[in-house]
Regions:
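Hydrophobic membrane-insertion alpha-helices, especially the h-region
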Residues: 2-17
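Short amphipathic alpha-helical segments
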Residues: 17-26, 113, 117-130, 212-220, ...
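Alpha-helical transmembrane signal-anchor/signal-peptide segments
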Residues: 22-37
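N-terminal beta-strand/beta-hairpin edge segment
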Residues: 35-120, 131, 135-177
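A general structural signal for short secondary-structure boundary/capping elements
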Residues: 87-89, 105-111, 125-129, 216-219, ...
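Short, highly charged low-complexity linear segments
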Residues: 103, 118-128, 140-141, 229-234, ...
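Extracytoplasmic/luminal low-complexity segments enriched in Pro/Gly and acidic/polar residues
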Residues: 183, 188-270
Length: 270
C-alpha cells in the first residue's frame, strides 16, 4: 500500500498552482520519491488543457525498471496504468501534510504490474528493517500464534529460492536465546484465490533436516490458508486485488487491480 501512495503522490505533480505541467515533471516527481530509479517512462494521455488545469486527466502510464525504495529494496520492473483521474486542485494546493488519498474527487482505479527477482528478494531479506516489517506482517495476518514465535525466536539468514511452476523454498534459522539454532526449510506452491486469498499448495517442512509429520503440516496449512487473506491489509483508502501471480526460476510477477477511494468525509475547499 505504501508503494501505491508513493506513485500517487508523484502523479499528483500533474497539477500545480500554475496549471499545466509536462510529463517530465511527473517523471521527476516520481523519481524524487524513490532512492533510485534505473529507467522510467511516463506517458500522460491529455484531456483538453482546461480540464487538466481543473485536475481532470484521461490516463497516466508509468513504466520502468530498477525501482529502489531503499538502498536494500529493489523492484525489478513496475508498470502502472490508471483510469481517468479527477483531482481536487484547491485541496491539493492547500494540502499541507494531508494524505495524498484525500485529494481525489472520484475514486481512482488502475492496473499495476510488479516484477521482483530472486536476487532482489534475498537482498531485501538481508536488511534488519525488512525482516522486522515481515515479522510484524506475519503477526498481523496470523494472529497471536505467530506473535509468540516472533517474540521467542530471532530469524537468522533467511533465503528464498524460486523453483518455478509457482513453487518457492524458504530457508532460515530460528535462534532462541541460550539455545542452539533450528534450521528450517519450507517448500510450497503458491496461488491466489478470489483475488485476495494467498493459498499454500502441497507444502513440506524440514526442521534440522527432519521432515515434519504430514498431519502437523496439514493442520498448519489449514490455519494458514484460512488467514492469508490480503484484504486484511487494505487500509481505509487503498484496496488491492491480485489478478495474476506467476513464479518462475528467476522472478516473481504480480498483476493487480488497484482502487484508491475518494474521501467521503473531507469537504471540498473549492
Amino acid at each position: 500500500m505504501e508503494l501505491i501512495a508513493i506513485l500517487l503522490s508523484g502523479i499528483l505533480a500533474l497539477v500545480s498552482p500554475v496549471g499545466l505541467v509536462l510529463d517530465r515533471t511527473v517523471e521527476s516527481a516520481i523519481r524524487s520519491r524513490f532512492d533510485k530509479i534505473e529507467q522510467l517512462q511516463v506517458r500522460i494521455d491529455n484531456a483538453p488543457n482546461y480540464q487538466i488545469v481543473q485536475g481532470k486527466v484521461e490516463r497516466v502510464r508509468v513504466a520502468g525498471r530498477g525501482f529502489w525504495l531503499t538502498p536494500e529494496i529493489r523492484i525489478a520492473a513496475l508498470e502502472l496504468e490508471t483510469d481517468p483521474l479527477d483531482i481536487d486542485v484547491a485541496r491539493l494546493q492547500k494540502r499541507g501534510k494531508a494524505p495524498v488519498t484525500t485529494l481525489l474527487e472520484q475514486p481512482l482505479q488502475g492496473g499495476l504490474r510488479l516484477v521482483i527477482t530472486q536476487q532482489d528478494i534475498n537482498q531485501a531479506l538481508l536488511s534488519p528493517a525488512v525482516t522486522k516489517r515481515l515479522s510484524k506482517l506475519a503477526s498481523r495476518i496470523l494472529g497471536s500464534s505467530a506473535e509468540l514465535i516472533v517474540q521467542r525466536y530471532e530469524f537468522v539468514n533467511p533465503k528464498i529460492e524460486l523453483l518455478g511452476n509457482n513453487r518457492v523454498r524458504l530457508q532460515l534459522e530460528l535462534q532462541e536465546q541460550g539455545a542452539d539454532k533450528l534450521s528450517v526449510s519450507v517448500e510450497t506452491g503458491v496461488s491466489v484465490a478470489e483475488e485476495t486469498k494467498l493459498q499454500l499448495i502441497e507444502p513440506s517442512v524440514l526442521v534440522n533436516n527432519t521432515p515434519v509429520p504430514p498431519p502437523v503440516v496439514a493442520a498448519l496449512l489449514s490455519t494458514l490458508n484460512d488467514r492469508l487473506d490480503l484484504s486484511t491489509l487494505d487500509d481505509a483508502a487503498i484496496a488491492l486485488r491480485i489478478l495474476k501471480l506467476d513464479v518462475n526460476r528467476e522472478q516473481l510477477e504480480v498483476a493487480a487491480f488497484v482502487k484508491v477511494k475518494a474521501p467521503t468525509a473531507v469537504p471540498s475547499v473549492r
